[in-house]
Amino acid sequence: MGDRICGPEIERLIQLLARLPGLGPRSARRAALHLIRKREELFGPLAEAMRVARDTIVSCSVCGNVDSCDPCTICRDERRDPSTLIVVETVGDLWALERSGAVKGRYHVLGGVLSPLDGVGPKDLNISSLIERVAAGGISEVVLAVNATVDGQTTAHYVTDLISHLNVRTTRLAHGVPVGGELDYLDEGTLAAALRARTDF
């Protein structure tokens, strides 16, 4: 009995779906089966949405976000506070902060973090354009909203050193106990950060 359980067309669909983040082989098979079962209502609209996205989505020349316009919708929004610049690693991080509804300023997407082990240096990231934006004036605070990883913190220190002479306040996101978090389930590093960043009650 052969290993193949379906034709090459379905195998190709599964292979492509498995390349998406968060989808392993099993999840890709489930997604493929769902698409096949609902092909009349999903395949056409999905293919059209993907074609339109491929043809119209661009990176914002100001902040690095992705959108169908350049500058992006966020950079064009005059209700945003132009004096606060939130620096993030990825567009996914930008979207996560936007979902929180807490950001009133504008963004700058670095496109990753400094990682010597992976061969990622300053020239591989959107750091020079960040320095240009801050140096142009009008920004009073730079919020370094990078991940609390070694590479993330290395990147934050590097950026801080570069903008330290530009007379802007540099802050970072607080680290510690998440809302609804139980202390017994938190790692030692998170607990230590929470203790260092404690506030009056």
Curated annotation (Swiss-Prot):
**Alphabetical list of Pfam families matching this protein:** RecR_C (PF21175), RecR_HhH (PF21176), Toprim_4 (PF13662)
Identify the coding gene.
recR
Keywords of the record, alphabetical order, are: DNA damage, DNA recombination, DNA repair, Metal-binding, Zinc, Zinc-finger
> What is the recorded name of this protein?
Recombination protein RecR
Domain Toprim per the UniProt entry, residue ranges: 83-178
Zn finger spans (C4-type): 60-75
Give the UniProt family note: Belongs to the RecR family.
Q: What GO biological process terms are annotated to this protein in UniProt?
A: DNA recombination; DNA repair
Alphabetized InterPro entries for the sequence:
DNA_Rcmb_RecR, Rcmb_RecR, Rcmb_RecR_Znf, TOPRIM_dom, TOPRIM_RecR
Matching NCBIfam families: recR (TIGR00615)
Q: Extract the GO molecular function terms from the UniProt entry.
A: DNA binding; zinc ion binding
